[in-house]
Each structure stands twice: as C-alpha cells, then as structure tokens.
UniProtKB/Swiss-Prot annotation:
Catalytic activity field: S-adenosyl-L-methionine + H(+) = S-adenosyl 3-(methylsulfanyl)propylamine + CO2
Gene Ontology BP terms: spermidine biosynthetic process
GO molecular-function terms, A-Z: adenosylmethionine decarboxylase activity
Cofactor dependency: pyruvate
Cofactor binding note of this UniProt entry: Binds 1 pyruvoyl group covalently per subunit.
HAMAP family, per the entry: AdoMetDC_2
Site description Cleavage (non-hydrolytic), residues in chain: K123, S124
Organism in which the protein naturally occurs: Desulfitobacterium hafniense (strain DSM 10664 / DCB-2)
A Pfam family it matches: AdoMet_dc
SUPFAM superfamilies associated with the record: S-adenosylmethionine decarboxylase (SSF56276)
Keyword annotations from UniProtKB, A to Z: Autocatalytic cleavage, Decarboxylase, Lyase, Polyamine biosynthesis, Pyruvate, S-adenosyl-L-methionine, Schiff base, Spermidine biosynthesis, Zymogen
Descriptive protein name: S-adenosylmethionine decarboxylase proenzyme
Keyword S-adenosyl-L-methionine among record annotations: yes
Length: 276
C-alpha cells in the first residue's frame, strides 16, 4: 500500500519527523540430532551472512528512496551477523553540491563526508542483526533477525515492509512502527504525523494478509503501532531439518508437531505456555 500524505499539508523547512519500523522475524525448525542442529545453525549462518544482509538492506534503502552514506558489516564467530547502514533523504557529496535528491546513490566505497555521519548517525539508519540458536532439549532450533529502519524527512520505512516479508519468509513477525518529534506547517502549527495510518496491516499486501493470522496493539494518540503475525497453515514438512516426514512414526509426528506449535505460540505471545 502506498504511504499517503495528509491532504493539503504544506511544511515549513525540513520535515523533522522521525519514523521507525522495527521488524523482528522468527524461523523455527525441528532438528532431531546434534548433527542436524549444528547443520541448521551453519545453514542459517551462511544463508544470512553479512554479505546477503547487506544486499537486503541496500534494497530497503532503494525502496524507501534513501541515499546510502556508509555501510558497516560484520560476521561473528561462532554465528550471527550484523549490518549498519547510514542513510540520508538527499545525496550529500562533492559531485552534488546542490543536494539534488535525484543524484546517484553515495556508495560505501566512496564513503560519507564526516559532517554527514554526524548529522545522520542517530536518525536515518538501517540495522540488521541475526540470532541463530538451538537447545538440546526437544530438538527445537530457531533463527531471529531484527531489522530497524529509521528515517527522518519525507521518506517512510513502511514502504519496505512487504519486501522484508518476502526476503525472509518468516514463520512469525513482530512489527513495531512509531513516529516521533514534530515538524511545522507554513503557519507554524506543529505536525506530529504526516501520513494516514491506523494499523501496520494497512501496508501489508493482501497475499501476506491471507497467509498470516495478525493481531494489533495500537496507541494512536502516542503514534505507536504494533502488529504480530503468525502463519495460518502448518505443514510439518516445512519445519523438519535433516529428517523427512516419511521417516517418522505417527506418534513422533504428533509429538514434534506439539513441540513446534508450543514453541511458536510462546514466541508469538511472548510468554511460556503449558503444553498444547
């Protein structure tokens, strides 16, 4: 869905509103043996390494219409990766003295100007961190990725929401969106939000709304929007790593399904739960 601005809103000077989308996604699987668990962690670590994450956040920057100032990326030992990208609404550089917003992206190879880093370090940025984990009890392994897209000015991180869902295809999503600060119209009146929204679901494509069960917690007067999403359909084949469903007995299938559903419910509701 397009981010629609409020009608007839004319601002004075720069748009000082800060808009932040926090996107937390979870992938859950059953890995029967220690070897399977190690293989799952290794697979996730390679699938979502720093280079792959950099490609994802670079596309996020393109989608929201931001220019890249700098990129820092790191793979961690024994597992995990992170990427931090500084972005700006307008291109800043010696070949763009007029701050033309349609000029080419400023790449990490060229590097940002020092004052650009200072100006945008705590406001316009994209970060992603990954957290693979497993536990020997129960055979459950999980992968979490946290993505934060924070912008100031007219660009909106909500534009990247569907791309992030497509990129990770997660089992569970916890999304938070908030707007902070204020800007002013030409008459000096404060503007605390500059676009229409009553739920993050407004910006989720129908094909994903059909796939996920969703619940909202909205504090509109504080410009806080919270949406949780969990896949509606459960196919055990999609959650087995290193083991085929046909290799399991009916009783094993039932037990594994119960463990996985319990794990997913606990993550979705954010609390430990009795046996399902």
């Amino acid at each position: 869905m397009e981010v629609k601005p409020l009608k007839k809103l004319r601002l004075y000077g720069f748009n000082n509103l800060t808009k932040t989308l926090s996107f937390n996604m979870y992938d859950i699987c059953y890995a029967k043996t220690p070897e399977h668990r190690d293989a799952y962690i290794q697979y996730i670590d390679e699938e979502y390494n720093a280079q792959r994450l950099t490609s994802i956040v670079t596309e996020v920057a393109r989608i929201v219409g931001a220019n890249i100032l700098n990129i820092a990326k790191q793979d961690y030992d024994p597992q995990g990766a992170s990427v931090t990208m500084l972005i700006a609404e307008e291109h800043l550089g010696p070949e763009n003295p007029d701050n033309d917003p349609f000029s080419p992206v400023y790449t990490d190879k060229e590097g940002p100007l020092p004052d650009a880093v200072v100006a945008h370090l705590d406001k316009s940025h994209i970060t992603v961190h990954t957290y693979p984990e497993s536990h020997p009890h129960g055979g459950i392994s999980t992968f979490r990725a946290d993505i934060d897209v924070s912008t100031c000015g007219q660009i909106s991180p909500l534009k990247a929401l569907n791309f992030l869902i497509e990129s990770f295809a997660p089992d569970i999503i916890v999304a938070d969106y908030r707007v902070r600060g204020f800007t002013r119209d030409v008459d000096g009146k404060k503007v605390f939000i500059d676009h229409k929204i009553n739920s993050i679901q407004n910006y989720v494509d129908r094909k994903y709304r059909d796939l996920y069960q969703m619940i909202d917690v909205t504090v509109f007067q504080e410009y806080i929007f919270h949406t949780k999403m969990i896949l509606k359909d459960f196919d055990l084949d999609n959650y087995l790593f290193g083991t085929a469903k046909k290799e399991l007995s009916i009783n094993d299938k039932r037990k594994i399904k119960q463990r996985l559903k319990k794990e997913m419910a606990e993550i979705f509701y954010g609390k430990n739960m009795p046996r399902i």
